[in-house]
């Protein structure tokens, strides 16, 4: 159930009318309602208690009436979904008929009336549909686009300037009236019976509307547009040469002294009556006070129903009612509309056949293009007719009863008379008959209500006549300036004036004022904004209250509000506001509160920029933009403070942590490399953290940790809520490292971070300076301590070396793995964990990030399934054991490998050491991990599948930093490693490959720092197996090759794919180093996996250094120099 703003209706135009489907021509039935309104929505505005509608399909007769109750906004809304079953898989057309349960036809306004769409197989080009919101009473920007009755009409249908051509129709009236063909009962039995140009009446009967005998489409005769053009030219010249006073005199003369013209007119009417047998003319007044049917179709078909009200009949002249004339009405030219009433104006397509639809919209009755044709049809009377219009537009309306019915009858008679006059056999009589037909047709509209005498036809003539300006859209633009220069004394808008007076007693008096409704809506909207700003002052409400005088769109005679009325409205609105201060308050729209919320929370920040006039005009010109996009300024942005704990829930939110970013498909998270996971990637990190499910990355857990950095507040967020089988508690996740590194990083409130996000150009870290500080503290906090491993402590080149490795303490929460070696380099996440460390444990080089788990050897995590729990174990187990926990020889434990230095294995993997091979023999520790993580698809190693898993990272689409490794093993430095080469560094080929994808550092200074660290610390760990001594040897050359690249630089992976962030940040770093090589090792074991990295999951598996520095891709030089 959807509605649109009161006071507006949605006009939908179908540009392309026919498409081919399965080699057959099919009429399009789908109408896309723009502005968030579903295809099947139709909106009514009425004061009646209920309305019933009928809908009939063209293939299967499915007709039914349904009563609708109006909502509290006074609108009738319904969702109509028609199932088309059986063979009717095409797009059937079905006209829609409305009828009020009560006979208050003058109290209903059709806001949107069109062919109700049925979703069909046929695809419709987007360009073929055009939707626009049009204020009630305003004429739309373009004339109606009618459905052609038959394929032949398509040929003659051209741009809208040619829309009113008579087409290539037959001789005058030889093809008969539109519905002469009649309607066959029962509909069509089979889809093969479906023919182009069929129309269905309200009873579900198929009516032939094609050209030919009985058809409605072929009756239109020759070109009208040339005559129209010449008439306009004559009118232009006569206007320039004639003063208004002379025009008035000539008009009076033509009205009072042309008895011969009236006689001719009566003769023509008698001829028409002989053909149609139902129109009686007495004296100069047509329809005197008699109830007559004006639409010839109805008499012929007997299918149409004409509804009579108290004094007059409301009749709808169909497009095809030529009244015996030789030509089709002007506005009908090449369109036999598939609606059951005439589409008389561009506002509302009325159905076109035998049914009578008494509910004409105000704008409908206001526009009658045939009258314009009558006015300008002859050179001699064009000026007098113009003056007639001028006089009538300034005179008040005298009709007192059902204006809608009178306007419809006038329009029908005018169209019939225009067609008859235009088809007169002699050119001399055509000029004389046109003026008389215009005056007589105008008098017919008022005769039913005011019983005027024959001499008073001019005074009451066009109570429903449109003014010249209303027809301006039918006049070439080149003539607009000339016509607009005429000083016509119209009160108010010419577009609305004529028929508004007639409607005083229906819509404007008996139904809620549409402008008042809009005023109320805007006032409520503004007041809601003011209440959010804690400004509930009456003054602010008054300022926001826009009177009708201030609204040019609504400047109609009936919109003016007295000061007292405005005060009453304001008081009522204030009372309503007090009752509805909840977020789900309805803003004058009948949409359910759960679907449409008044902008709240942070939305008030923009309230100063909201101008109610702009708001209203924006809605009026919205085009295809959704109303929700204007009224509900992106709920995802307004709820930033709501879902602090649900960072992952809203993909649009920047939630305070980068994590979200990662999650966002946008890959905004370059930082995290680790993040790659992004939801998509499964990349270990996030996925693991959040769902371990992804596992893909064996390292999952590890990576997961990385994400944690990005999470807003691990203690309160979903991140801390592990499943029951997981042993990691939120407190353990929040436990800072014993290293002072953690203390240097403080968690910032999500609100301040959200502000930083809006200001910071970086897509990743919210606070670069804090990261720089943490790195600085991390580097300075490193003190030389002995390593508690079977291998000797890492030698330092000099006793005064500024960068030293922290001691690895099996009992501490710090990551015992040698990965701590890199902790000095890695940035610290918001939770204080080093981004990379754990990765080593993960065998899979997940240096990345894992940190969060720190405690847990990433490997364990991996092995242990996504559960980071393992990590804890690892820590307590002193790394080696940890692996055991994983069962699958956590690489670290070497158990399976028998290699004592779990770290070394990891390190090797991460760094270059192919050592893995040794440990697992074929299964590098990583592989073991893989095995452990059967869950993790990633376990590439063991599982050849792993490749795919690795791809996971790739899945990120390369957007994630890790993506380098993407499925194509994108960067597999591994290739070299596949041979189980122990020292990647030794492999010159590897160096070349590494240089192919160099990481990007924010500043070259950071690269120098890393080189210094590596120069001073080369780890030589002796494994029990002398054969494979893990050897950390970073080639200075290879690191030096990692030169800073420009921000938008792109890196090509081994598969030739360019990896860049959507944001334009080159996120890729991983591979770059020897690390990948290690991963390769894994692959070596399982060369199949190639993904090597896969297991590692984190493509980032590359050097933790790189993954850490990645986030610093845009650091100001001063902060780096301090390091």
Swiss-Prot record:
Residues 190-199 have a biased composition (Acidic residues). Residues 136-229, 262-471, 483-514, 527-609, 629-769, 782-812, 835-1005, 1070-1099 are annotated as: Disordered. Residues 632-646 have a biased composition (Basic and acidic residues). Residues 166-185, 211-223 have a biased composition (Gly residues). Residues 262-322, 344-387, 397-464, 489-499, 527-548, 563-585, 647-707, 727-769, 835-984, 1070-1098 have a biased composition (Low complexity). Residues 329-343, 590-604, 790-799 have a biased composition (Polar residues). This is Putative uncharacterized protein DDB_G0277255. It comes from Dictyostelium discoideum (Social amoeba).
């Amino acid at each position: 159930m959807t509605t649109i703003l009161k006071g507006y209706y949605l006009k939908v135009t179908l540009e392309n009318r026919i498409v081919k489907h399965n080699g057959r021509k099919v009429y399009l039935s789908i109408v896309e309602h723009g502005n968030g309104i579903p295809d099947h929505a139709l909106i009514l505005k009425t004061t009646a208690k209920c309305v019933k509608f009928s809908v009939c399909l063209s293939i299967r007769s499915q007709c039914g009436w349904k009563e609708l109750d109006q909502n509290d906004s006074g609108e009738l809304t319904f969702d109509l979904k028609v199932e088309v079953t059986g063979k009717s898989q095409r797009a059937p057309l079905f006209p829609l008929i409305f009828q009020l349960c009560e006979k208050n036809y003058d109290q209903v306004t059709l806001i949107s009336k069109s062919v109700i769409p049925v979703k069909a197989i046929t695809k419709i080009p987007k360009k073929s549909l055009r939707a626009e919101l049009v204020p009630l009473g305003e004429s739309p920007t373009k004339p109606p686009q009618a459905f052609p009755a038959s394929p032949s009409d398509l040929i003659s249908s051209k741009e809208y300037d040619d829309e009113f051509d008579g087409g290539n129709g037959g001789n005058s009236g030889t093809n008969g009236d539109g519905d002469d063909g009649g309607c066959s009962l029962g509909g069509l039995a089979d889809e093969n019976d479906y023919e182009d140009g069929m129309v269905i009446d309200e009873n579900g009967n198929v009516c032939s509307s094609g050209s030919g005998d009985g058809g409605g489409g072929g009756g239109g005769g020759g070109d009208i547009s040339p005559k129209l053009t010449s008439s306009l030219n004559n009118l232009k010249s006569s206007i320039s040469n004639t003063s208004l006073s002379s025009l008035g005199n000539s008009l009076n003369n033509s009205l009072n002294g042309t008895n011969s013209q009236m006689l001719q007119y009566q003769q023509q009417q008698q001829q028409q009556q002989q053909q149609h047998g139902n129109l009686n003319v007495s004296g100069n007044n047509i329809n005197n006070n008699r109830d007559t049917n004006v639409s010839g179709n109805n008499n012929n078909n007997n299918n149409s129903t004409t509804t009579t009200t108290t004094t007059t009949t409301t009749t709808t002249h169909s497009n095809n009612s030529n009244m015996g004339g030789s030509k089709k009405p002007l506005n009908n030219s090449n369109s036999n509309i598939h609606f059951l009433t005439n589409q008389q104006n561009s506002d509302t397509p009325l159905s076109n056949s035998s049914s009578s639809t008494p509910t004409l919209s105000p704008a409908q009755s206001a526009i009658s293009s045939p009258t314009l044709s009558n006015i300008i049809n002859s050179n001699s009377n064009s000026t007098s007719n113009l003056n007639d219009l001028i006089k009538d537009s300034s005179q008040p309306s005298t009709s007192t009863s059902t204006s809608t019915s009178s306007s419809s009858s006038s329009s029908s008679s005018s169209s019939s008379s225009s067609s008859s006059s235009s088809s007169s056999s002699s050119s001399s009589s055509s000029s004389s008959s046109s003026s008389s037909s215009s005056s007589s047709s105008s008098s017919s509209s008022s005769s039913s209500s005011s019983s005027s005498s024959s001499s008073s036809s001019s005074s009451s003539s066009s109570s429903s006549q449109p003014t010249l300006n209303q027809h301006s859209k039918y006049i070439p633009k080149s003539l607009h300036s000339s016509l607009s220069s005429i000083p016509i004394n119209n009160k108010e808008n010419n577009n609305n004036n004529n028929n508004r007076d007639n409607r005083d007693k229906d819509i404007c008096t008996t139904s809620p004022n549409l402008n008042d409704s809009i005023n109320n809506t805007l006032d409520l909207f503004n007041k809601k904004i003011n209440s959010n700003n804690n400004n509930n002052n009456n003054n602010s409400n008054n300022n926001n209250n826009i009177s009708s005088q201030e609204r040019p769109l609504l400047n109609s005679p009936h919109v003016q509000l007295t000061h007292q009325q405005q005060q009453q409205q304001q008081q009522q609105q204030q009372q309503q506001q007090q009752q509805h201060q909840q977020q789900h308050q309805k803003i004058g729209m009948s949409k359910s509160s759960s679907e449409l919320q008044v902008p709240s929370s942070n939305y008030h920040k923009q309230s100063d920029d909201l101008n109610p006039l702009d708001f209203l005009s924006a809605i009026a010109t919205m085009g295809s933009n959704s109303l929700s996009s204007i009224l509900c300024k992106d709920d995802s942005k307004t709820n930033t403070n709501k879902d602090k704990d649900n960072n992952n829930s809203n993909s649009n939110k920047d939630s305070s942590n980068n994590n979200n970013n990662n999650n966002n498909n946008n890959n905004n998270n370059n930082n995290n490399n680790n993040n790659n996971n992004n939801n998509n990637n499964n990349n270990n990190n996030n996925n693991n953290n959040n769902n371990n499910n992804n596992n893909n990355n064996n390292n999952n857990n590890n990576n997961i940790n990385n994400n944690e950095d990005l999470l807003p507040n691990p203690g309160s967020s979903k991140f801390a809520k592990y499943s029951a089988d997981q042993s990691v508690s939120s407190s353990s996740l929040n436990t800072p490292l014993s290293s002072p590194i953690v203390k240097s990083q403080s968690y910032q409130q999500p609100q301040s971070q959200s502000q930083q996000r809006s200001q910071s150009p970086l897509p990743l870290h919210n606070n670069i300076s804090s990261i720089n500080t943490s790195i600085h503290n991390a580097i300075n906090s490193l003190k030389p301590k002995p390593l508690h491993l079977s291998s000797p402590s890492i030698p330092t080149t000099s006793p005064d070396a500024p960068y030293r490795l922290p001691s690895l303490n099996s009992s501490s929460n710090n990551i015992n793995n040698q990965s701590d070696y890199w902790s000095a380099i890695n940035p610290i996440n918001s939770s204080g964990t080093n981004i990379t460390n754990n990765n080593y444990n993960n065998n899979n080089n997940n240096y990345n990030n894992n940190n969060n788990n720190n405690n847990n050897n990433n490997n364990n995590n991996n092995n242990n399934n996504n559960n980071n729990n393992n990590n804890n174990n690892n820590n307590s187990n002193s790394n080696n054991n940890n692996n055991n926990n994983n069962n699958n020889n956590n690489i670290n434990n070497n158990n399976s490998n028998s290699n004592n230095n779990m770290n070394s294995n990891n390190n090797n993997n991460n760094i270059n050491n192919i050592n893995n091979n040794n440990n697992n023999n074929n299964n590098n520790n990583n592989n073991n991990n893989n095995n452990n993580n059967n869950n993790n698809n990633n376990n590439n190693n063991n599982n050849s599948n792993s490749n795919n898993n690795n791809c996971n990272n790739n899945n990120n689409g390369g957007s994630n930093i890790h993506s380098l490794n993407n499925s194509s093993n994108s960067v597999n430095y591994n290739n070299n490693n596949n041979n189980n080469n122990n020292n990647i560094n030794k492999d010159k080929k590897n160096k070349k490959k590494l240089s192919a994808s160099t990481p990007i550092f924010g500043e070259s200074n950071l690269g120098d720092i890393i080189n210094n660290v590596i120069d001073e610390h080369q780890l030589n760990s002796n494994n029990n197996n002398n054969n494979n001594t893990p050897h950390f040897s970073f080639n200075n050359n290879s690191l030096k090759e990692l030169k800073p690249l420009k921000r938008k630089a792109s890196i090509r992976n081994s598969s030739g794919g360019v990896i860049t962030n959507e944001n334009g940040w080159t996120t890729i770093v991983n591979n770059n180093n020897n690390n990948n090589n290690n991963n390769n090792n894994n692959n070596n074991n399982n060369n199949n996996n190639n993904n090597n990295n896969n297991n590692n999951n984190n493509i980032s598996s590359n050097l933790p250094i790189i993954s850490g520095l990645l986030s610093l891709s845009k650091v100001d030089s001063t902060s780096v120099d301090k390091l």
